[in-house]
Amino acid sequence: VSDRRWRDGAEDRITAVLRDAADRSSASDELAAHIDDWPTRYHFGRARTNLLHPLRLGTGVRILDVGAGSGVNSRWAAEQGASVVAVEGDALRAEAAALRCEDLDVEVRHGSATDVVDDNGFDLVLCIGVLEYAGNEPDRFLAHLAGLVRPGGALVVAIENRFGLAYWLQADEDHLGLPFVGLEGYPPVAATGATATVRTFSRPELAGHLTAAGLTAQRWYQPFPDYKLPTTVLTDRCYDQPDAVDLVDQLVGPPIDRSRMGGRVSADERAIHRQVVGAGHGADMANSFLVVAATDDTALDRRSDGDALAWRFTGDRRRAHLRVRRLTDDGVRRIDRRATHPVDTATGDGRWLVLRSPGGATDDYTPGPNLEQVALDRIRAGDLTGVRVVLAAWSAVADRGAVHRTVSDAEAHPFLSAGSRTVLPGDHLDLGLDNLVGPVDRPDELRFVDDEWEATGGVDRHLVAVRTCWKLAAALVAGGTRHPWPPSTTVDRLADKLCA
């Protein structure tokens, strides 16, 4: 696993950016400003470290990061107080990792993971995006890594699922760049010399390899759209919930990132995912896996979070606005909202937009489909009258809080134009269909959830309506939802039709 098959060609640029950067932290706005293609997104995107939230890290935890790349995960683990040994087989990436982590307790080694020997052992051994390069000896490789885990510790593996939903929907296999080749068993004719031994695994296959390494206690997580830049991480328990179809759909949304997964995906992926979950195959057909494996359940509980149902993360915002929602259910389902990285509590643009509860908050989860899900179902059915009913329900909720007055020039902001005459409360900036839950035919019973932002002085009703329709149109396109308009209709044109 010490060759250089995973280079993306951007290593020199990544190293140069890191060398000049004043802020090399895992959530650095400075580094994120350099994102302009897939390699820079991979190395500098803040979503990379979302994958590690199910792990119990902190002061005194010793970590081995195998195939550390440019040091993204090593950096984040060390920021949590862990002591990290980062091993990277490529010299250029090892140099980048050393720069990324130079001010923290991280020892970067250039070499092969199979050469690592450590008498003290590690509490966690991270094998993220590496096992697929173990060639024809995955059992031997995993056994070596398992031997580096100290008593009470765990091995953490992240890898694509060979039978993941994305691959069935014709997304390109991540390493060979061709559709279906993993499902076909990696035929040699499809590979190059550099990819001839690349292999990913189904859930039963991977579970078997971990068991063969003596790691019989396993806790499985499902990152979406995959483990590289996850916006959601689910647990097996999430799929066992009575409302799993709606719950998983709410948490995941479109299960495939069409902007970077390649291939020719043309199906309604969100509808298919709902069917897969409803049939009981959701966990086995996740696009990728995060597995925490140990010799006993006590070690699993010590090193990973077994209480959560799921984690959902905000998009790649500025550091001050990055949030995680941790969903739990101990008899009452709750959502705990927290910053993913330490920030000042004063967040917003300093003038008109404020992030509510910046220090975090816990709310009860409101069960049931949200109005976006209802609207998508009615659009799939070609029921435009039903879509109008959904939008009318939204309108009724908006009108409850409306105030009729004339907005002055002094109080105007991007979502409150001077001269506006119908003003909604400031938190109604977030009044999208995805944030309304309850019976569509009884608008008075609809509950407004996840009202994260607040605009000073209120927001213009018309602009919020346009934003609501645009978000629904974006959801239609992102998930490939079948609709009665021409397939080439853009998000903006769909939003126009919905607003009308």
Language model features: what each stretch is:
Residues 415-483:
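Catalytic activation segment of kinase domains across protein kinase-like and atypical kinase folds
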Residues 117-125:
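A short acidic, Gly/Pro-enriched loop at the edge of an enzyme's catalytic core
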Residues 139-154:
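A short glycine-rich, Lys/Arg-flanked "PGG" loop and its adjoining helix->strand segment in the class I
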Residues 299-410:
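Conserved ATP-binding subdomain of kinase catalytic cores across diverse folds
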Residues 1-23:
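N-terminal auxiliary segments of SAM/dcSAM-dependent transferases
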Residues 70-81:
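Conserved SAM-binding loop of SAM-dependent methyltransferases across substrates and taxa
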Residues 157-179:
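Conserved class I S-adenosyl-L-methionine
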Residues 196-220:
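Short alpha-helix
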